[in-house]
Structure formats: structure tokens, C-alpha cells
């Protein structure tokens, strides 16, 4: 028996040695721009600390050349790693890209205790572009409203600048809400009245065009012709930024939006959230480059969950239940496994782990975990954000996703809709940043 046990032990040792040699000879797995690092339990680890990754990326962007009064990335969506426009993609998403960019840069400015004035300077540049260069004409149903799409390096955008899936004279109401909210935050930081004036203009235009929603249409359509208000796509899934805009303006002394906030929250609570458990038809349409009208997306439910987690009982005592329903809807429809990590895609028609949506997923799950004390999503949040950050190169230049090695691309995915998410996850669990 002793002899047999010794043989088994020798056999196991030989097997382990062979497996070690095979592993050593196999090429290392690459995620994004780096060799993947896993711990003994198979959990994806950061390629560098989150703090270091953040500083590398911010340094790379703060070195971006300034032309026509703006850092180049402010005026284009498809930027190469040479800080230049990708020649085959002149299309541009000013409100989403620069609105989320302002939010990211203001949050980072607070993170560094306001020690680098260039960060605020770049946030102001994004705000200035929205206010000065990206408005509809002062006529029609959506006058002087920030454009959802346009053309790179135009100063200002022409009246017929609609691009991607927008028609030439179309805007997206929810993107105006994103821009308006960001401009209100920028006013709060700088006290520059032009940012407040545009935030108020966007909000007032939204209120003027608000309609009664039901089970087939939301209080605003997804797209409208700004000249006559003709809708295209009756459902706009991203309503949380209208709530944010109205609330922030109220906090800044403009109380005219309280009724609109109340009516909108009542619609979300009574119609949109219950729709998660049925067809999901009120969670379709968000991304500027799509016009498929039954295309559910992850961005809108995750950002509503973020808002509820931030507000907690101040908005509704059922905030935990609602937030979990929004996260579970996202997990059900948009997640898949890449390299052993549960990642989140954007929409029914695109499940790739783009930087904007994956960092949103990681941040919101981290915030929920910290706010509730639940461990259910905590590990998923950590690995999702780790995966996302593998897209950042050693020099700080990010790619648009970590699915394969790449540098540059969609600036919203590379950078502007990512930094604020990383900071939110770091605030939820500071130990993850070290």
C-alpha cells in the first residue's frame, strides 16, 4: 500500500510538473494592451493600480494639443493616438461626449483637491464648445438646444449637421439633458453665467416639449426634428438626466422645474420601472449611431440605478428594490463572459465591452454594493473595472475597449464617459484604487 501511495505521489508530481511546463510554454493571455494578470483563484487583477492608471490617462489627455481654442478631443469623436482625427469618421457626438467629459473632469478636479488648474480649464473648454459651437438655430421647437450629433472640427456646427443615425435637422432630447446637467455643474464650480444660461435654456425647451407618457411612449421621443418637433422613435429610455437637470437647477435657485420633475418621476416609478419585468419596451434607444426602435440598452437602466443609489430614501424608500431590478435587467440582457470576466455590452445589437458602458457597469455595481452592504455584485464590479482598464496603454493613451489591443477611437468610450465611473468605483471601495 505504501508503495502504491508513493507511486501516486510521484505521478501527481510529474503531472503537476508537466502542466507547469505547458503553462510556461504557452503564450500569455493578452487583454487590451497588456498581459492579463490573474490570482490563484482565477480573478482578474489590475495591470497596474487604479490610481496609477488614472494618472497616466489624465496626463495623456492633459497633453492634448489645443487648436481653435479647444483641446482636440473636445471637437472630434474618433481621435487617433496621435491626437488627430480619424480620416474616415468625421461624425461627432458633442453633447454626450462633452457632457460626460465635464462630469468626469469636475469629479477628477475634486479628486485631486483642485491642485491642477488645467483640469478645470479643459472642463471649461468642453462647456464652451457646447455653448458656443453646438447649438441649434434660435427658431423652431427646440431653439438654441445642444446638438446630439454633428461634424468634427466645425466652429460652429451648421444647422444641418446631424450625423450618425440622426437626420440632418434632428436632435435627441436626452442628450440635451446630459449637456444641460453638465453645464449646471460647471456653473456651480465656476459661477460663469453662460453655463447656467444654457442649462436653463435646455431645461426650458425640454419642459415646453414634455408630453404625457404611457406604455408605448415616453415623455419625450428619442429623436425630433428641431424645426417642427416631428418625432422619430417614440421611446427615449434615458430619463434620469432630465431628473438630474431639473433637480440641479432647483438646487441652484430655479424652482420652475419642480412640477416637471414630479411628473417625470411619477412616470418612471409607475410605468418605466415596472416595464423591466415585462417586455422592456420602455428601455430601447439610447446610442446616437443606432435607429433600431426595439433595441434595448444597458446605459439607461444603469444610470437610473446610479441616480437612485445616490439619492436613496430622499427619492423613494424602495430605492434598493428599484436599483436591484435595474441591475438585474442589465445582467439578464447585456452581459457575457470574456476572458473569465462577466462584462457588460451596450445594447441588444452590440454586446462588445466598450469602455463607456463597461465602466458604467463596474461603477454602478460597486456603488450598489457599498450603499447596501450586499456582496452579490461586489466581485463582478471589481473584475469589470479591471477588465476595462486593460485598454489603457503604458503611456496613458486608452483604447475604446479591452477586447483587443487598440489605441484611440470613440472618445466617449476611451475617456470622457469612463473617468467619472472609475472615480465612483474608487470612492465606493478606496482599497481597490491602491
Locate each region found by the language model.
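Bacterial N-terminal signal peptides that target proteins for export
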Residues: 3-14
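Bacterial N-terminal signal peptides
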Residues: 13-22
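Low-complexity, Ser/Thr/Pro/Gly-enriched N-terminal "stalk/linker" regions
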Residues: 28-97, 118-163, 201, 205, ...
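Well-ordered alpha-helical segments within folded domains of soluble proteins
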Residues: 32-39, 90-110, 162-164, 168-188, ...
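Non-catalytic carbohydrate-binding regions of carbohydrate-active enzymes
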Residues: 60-70, 136, 190, 204-209, ...
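Short glycine/proline-rich turn/loop motifs
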Residues: 77-88, 153-166, 220-228, 281-289, ...
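Solenoidal tandem-repeat scaffolds enriched in leucines and small polar residues
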Residues: 192-271
Amino acid at each position: 500500500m505504501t508503495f502504491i501511495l508513493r507511486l501516486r505521489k510521484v505521478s501527481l508530481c510529474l503531472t503537476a510538473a508537466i502542466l507547469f511546463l505547458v503553462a510556461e510554454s504557452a503564450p500569455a493571455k493578452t487583454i487590451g494592451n497588456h498581459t492579463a494578470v490573474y490570482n490563484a483563484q482565477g480573478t482578474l487583477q489590475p495591470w497596474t493600480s487604479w490610481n496609477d492608471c488614472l494618472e497616466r490617462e489624465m496626463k495623456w489627455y492633459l497633453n492634448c494639443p489645443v487648436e481653435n481654442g479647444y483641446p482636440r478631443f473636445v471637437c472630434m469623436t474618433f481621435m487617433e493616438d496621435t491626437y488627430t482625427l480619424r480620416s474616415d469618421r468625421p461624425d461627432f457626438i458633442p453633447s454626450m461626449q462633452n457632457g460626460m467629459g465635464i462630469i468626469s473632469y469636475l469629479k477628477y478636479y475634486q479628486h485631486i483637491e483642485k491642485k491642477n488648474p488645467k483640469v478645470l480649464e479643459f472642463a471649461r473648454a468642453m462647456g464652451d464648445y457646447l455653448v458656443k459651437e453646438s447649438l441649434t438655430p434660435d427658431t423652431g421647437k427646440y431653439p438654441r438646444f445642444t446638438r446630439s450629433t454633428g461634424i468634427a472640427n466645425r466652429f460652429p456646427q451648421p444647422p444641418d449637421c446631424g450625423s450618425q443615425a440622426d437626420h440632418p435637422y434632428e436632435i435627441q432630447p436626452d442628450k440635451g439633458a446630459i449637456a444641460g446637467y453638465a453645464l449646471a455643474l460647471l456653473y456651480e464650480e465656476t459661477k460663469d453665467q453662460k453655463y447656467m444660461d444654457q442649462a436653463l435654456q435646455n431645461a426650458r425647451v425640454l419642459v415646453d416639449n414634455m408630453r404625457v407618457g404611457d406604455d408605448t411612449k415616453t415623455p419625450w421621443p428619442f429623436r425630433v426634428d428641431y424645426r417642427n418637433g416631428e418625432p422619430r422613435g417614440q421611446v427615449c429610455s434615458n430619463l434620469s438626466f432630465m431628473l438630474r437637470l431639473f433637480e440641479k437647477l432647483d438646487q441652484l435657485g430655479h424652482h420652475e422645474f419642480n412640477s416637471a420633475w414630479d411628473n417625470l418621476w411619477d412616470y418612471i416609478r409607475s410605468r418605466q420601472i415596472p416595464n423591466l419585468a415585462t417586455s422592456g419596451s420602455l428601455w430601447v434607444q439610447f446610442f446616437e449611431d443606432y435607429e433600431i426602435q426595439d433595441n434595448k440598452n444597458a446605459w439607461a437602466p444603469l444610470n437610473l440605478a446610479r441616480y437612485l443609489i445616490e439619492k436613496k430614501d430622499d427619492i423613494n424608500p424602495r430605492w434598493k428594490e428599484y436599483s436591484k431590478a435595474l441591475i438585474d435587467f442589465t445582467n439578464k440582457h447585456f452581459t457575457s463572459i470574456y476572458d473569465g470576466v462577466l462584462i457588460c455590452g451596450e445594447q441588444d445589437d452590440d454586446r462588445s465591452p466598450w469602455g463607456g458602458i463597461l465602466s458604467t457597469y463596474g461603477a454602478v455595481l460597486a456603488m450598489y454594493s457599498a450603499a447596501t452592504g450586499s456582496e452579490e455584485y461586489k466581485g463582478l464590479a471589481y473584475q469589470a473595472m479591471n477588465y476595462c482598464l486593460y485598454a489603457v496603454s503604458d503611456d496613458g493613451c486608452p483604447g475604446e475597449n479591452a477586447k483587443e489591443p487598440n489605441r484611440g477611437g470613440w472618445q466617449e468610450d476611451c475617456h470622457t464617459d469612463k473617468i467619472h465611473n472609475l472615480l465612483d468605483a474608487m470612492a465606493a471601495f478606496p482599497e481597490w484604487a491602491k
